[in-house]
Design a protein with these regions (language model features):
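Short glycine-rich anion-binding loops that position phosphate/pyrophosphate groups of nucleotides
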Residues: 15-16, 67-68, 132
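Adenosine-phosphate binding glycine-rich loop
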Residues: 54, 58-98
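Short, small-residue-biased leader/transition segments that mark boundaries at the very start
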Residues: 2-7
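Rossmann-fold NAD(P)-binding glycine/threonine-rich loop
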Residues: 38-60
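Active-site-lining helix/loop region of Rossmann-like oxidoreductase modules
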Residues: 82-179
Length: 179
């Protein structure tokens, strides 16, 4: 049934580490792009290990983080880099918002506690290749998510709940774009 779904383009909700492993495999085998919205980056790292080479050979895209959680950060950095035409050391983005978290997101967060992987979400370059990581200063890129007052905008700021996932997505996109 998943194979037919891959051929016809459908969607599936998370937790992605529980429901989407076979789906991504089927997409790669069928030559179908995979797009989703997950912050389960340890699972995403495992996807990269399992499928990146085959997807690249078939010229298909596996993009597991392409929703509101990641697109503003990822595309904002891309366009800022392109506009300034220089290497960027740090980008801070701010927005005002409110809302809630879906049941699927909560279930995904809890399911990651039991997900077995050799990787750690705490690594700032979790989604990058070993070759790329060798060129980066890991200690300068550690997460520093704090509530703080921002003089430039005269407001208090708290980290976005998905910041730990987004920083890794942006770093991977940067590596892929630089190739």
């Amino acid at each position: 049934r998943q194979r037919q779904m891959c051929i016809r383009d459908r969607s599936l909700a998370g937790p992605f580490n529980r429901y989407s492993d076979n789906l991504v495999t089927q997409c790669v085998e069928a030559g179908t792009h995979y797009l989703d919205i997950t912050g389960e980056n340890i699972w995403v790292r495992d996807l990269i290990d399992k499928h990146h080479e085959a997807a690249e050979k078939k010229q298909i895209k596996i993009i597991p983080s392409c929703g509101y959680d990641s697109i503003p950060s990822d595309m904002g950095c891309f366009y800022l880099h392109r506009s300034l035409n220089q290497e960027l050391q740090r980008i801070d983005g701010y927005h005002r918002g409110n809302g809630g978290v879906s049941g699927g997101t909560i279930e995904s967060a809890f399911s990651m506690r039991n997900y077995k992987s050799k990787y750690s979400m705490g690594h700032p370059f979790l989604l990058n290749s070993k070759e790329y990581i060798k060129t980066q200063n890991i200690s300068e890129n550690r997460d520093n998510f704090k509530i703080k007052y921002i003089d430039d905008i005269k407001l208090w700021s708290a980290p976005f709940v998905m910041a730990i996932a987004n920083t890794r997505v942006v770093r991977r996109s940067s590596e892929i774009h630089d190739k």
